[in-house]
Amino acid sequence: FLQFKGYAQNIARLRFDDDFSYLKADSLKTTWKEKIKNVSLGSNFQWSLGGEWREQYQSYEHLNFGEVPSDFITDSPHQLMHRIMFHANVTYKNTFRLFAQFNNTARFLNPNPITSQLDENLLSIHQLFFDAHLKGNWLLRLGRQEYAWGQERFVATKEGPNTRHPFYGATLKYVSPRNKIDIFTSNPMKMNPGVFDDVRSSESLSGIYYMHTPSKSRF
């Protein structure tokens, strides 16, 4: 029998949850990609860079059951959905953190989309928030941020559309091995197709999300 074993860093669902602290020692950085994931700036600052790229081809037959505006060229379009996102993360003494993520989305081959505001956003600051670690397991997050809880039935990043959905607000977070609490108040961002033209919506979203992980010994 032949056996193969590989090791890789776990990739989180959301980019700001990625943890590359295991690369803090320079001797563990063997490739250029690892070198940009944890860079020391003196003894107190660390920063990292990253990104993601998605190209998605879609083809439809009788889009929206054929109920499309009269000026549409066809109700059976095809389109190429393009998305690139870059992010930078800076931390200070594991106490403060600044996270920024830029978004570029575009639609090709289809001049008549039904949801253009979700298909194209040429350049935007998708996320820009500041974290402050408080006493105990508490953390305060302020700024433009993504929300995704549980199975994402109620609040999600909306991964299906080409442009993901951020919020602008404040979140007080508590994290322990078995309990997670998010207390939040925010405004959804209204995405526009141009360059740096997204605005805060007048709608608001506030609430408390709690998740408990029971002990394995109970089962």
Describe the function of each predicted region.
Residues 6-76:
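N-terminal periplasmic/intermembrane-space "pro-region" immediately following the signal or transit peptide
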Residues 45, 76-82, 121-126, 164-168, ...:
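Residues that define the transmembrane beta-barrel architecture of outer-membrane proteins
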Residues 47-55, 98-100, 138-140, 181-183, ...:
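Transmembrane beta-strands of outer-membrane beta-barrel proteins
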Residues 51, 84-90, 127-132, 170-174, ...:
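Residues on the lipid-exposed face of transmembrane beta-strands in outer-membrane beta-barrel proteins
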Residues 53-61, 94, 102-108, 144-148, ...:
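Transmembrane beta-strands of outer-membrane beta-barrel pores
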Residues 61-82, 92-136, 152-157:
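Surface-exposed loop and membrane-interface regions of Gram-negative outer-membrane beta-barrel proteins
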Residues 136-140, 158-219:
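Signature for the C-terminal beta-barrel architecture of outer-membrane proteins
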